[in-house]
């Protein structure tokens, strides 16, 4: 069974998401979560019935059914908590959308979700960032210029009272750098870490000792290890502030003779 997200995209139904949301609502009011599995199964059966009858299953359909099920089984405090959870999620979506709507093709929603998750405090709200960003963003600018404005907004919001904006600015700077790097690599026809090592060696920008002492399979394995430290919650890039990442990019990356970082 597939469900339809708010974006219109489809994804496989996963009952664990319902269970997690209800468990969070139960825990927030001090209720034991023992009934969650049974309630989730009941909701899943109703969704299957609706789907079999030819109905499309939207995210809102599921959330409405969760509320109805909690009310049916006399969980007033829990349903109130779930409603507040829905409202909170809606506000976060709205805050992200206000920013993403200012870009024509660059998709920042995933990055903004990560920021909301890692910086839940009120002083790091995306609404505040949007107000700062919109104060000097011009209409009709390119996505590249808009991203530069967003980085500038986050940097300018860094204060003694809210110092972690510098980490948020760093994330946007990394997005900008990745876009530029991808374009450079595509122009050079470089599609892998191994090919990058080969190119740098051939151009005299990197010692030949790596390609001489390690096979392609070994270098590919190194690339996987590096990539594992560059994604998810363990992303080491998240340890860098804006100023430290900016310094790293400007001074310590290997560059071509045309001063292009690779």
Would you name each region that the model predicts?
Residues 1-262:
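Extended catalytic cores of very large enzyme megasubunits
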């Amino acid at each position: 069974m597939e469900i339809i997200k708010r974006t219109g995209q489809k994804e496989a139904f996963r009952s664990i998401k319902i269970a997690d949301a209800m468990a969070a609502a139960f825990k927030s009011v001090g209720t034991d979560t023992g009934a969650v599995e049974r309630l989730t199964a009941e909701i899943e059966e109703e969704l299957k019935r609706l789907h079999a009858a030819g109905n499309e299953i939207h995210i809102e359909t599921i959330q409405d059914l969760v509320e109805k099920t909690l009310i049916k089984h006399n969980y007033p405090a829990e349903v109130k908590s779930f409603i507040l959870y829905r409202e909170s999620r809606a506000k976060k979506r709205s805050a992200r959308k206000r920013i993403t709507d200012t870009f024509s093709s660059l998709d920042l929603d995933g990055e903004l979700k990560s920021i909301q998750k890692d910086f839940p405090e009120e002083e790091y709200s995306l609404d505040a960032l949007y107000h700062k960003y919109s104060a000097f963003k011009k209409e009709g600018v390119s996505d590249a210029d808009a991203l530069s404005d967003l980085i500038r907004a986050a940097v300018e919001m860094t204060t003694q009272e809210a110092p972690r904006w510098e980490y948020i600015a760093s994330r946007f700077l990394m997005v900008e750098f990745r876009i530029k790097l991808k374009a450079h690599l595509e122009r050079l026809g470089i599609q892998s870490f191994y090919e990058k090592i080969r190119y740098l060696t051939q151009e005299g920008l990197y010692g030949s000792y790596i390609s001489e002492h390690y096979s392609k399979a070994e270098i590919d394995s190194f690339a996987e290890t590096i990539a594992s430290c560059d994604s998810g919650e363990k992303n080491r890039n998240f340890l860098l502030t804006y100023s430290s990442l900016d310094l790293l990019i400007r001074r310590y990356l290997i560059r071509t003779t045309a001063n292009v970082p690779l």
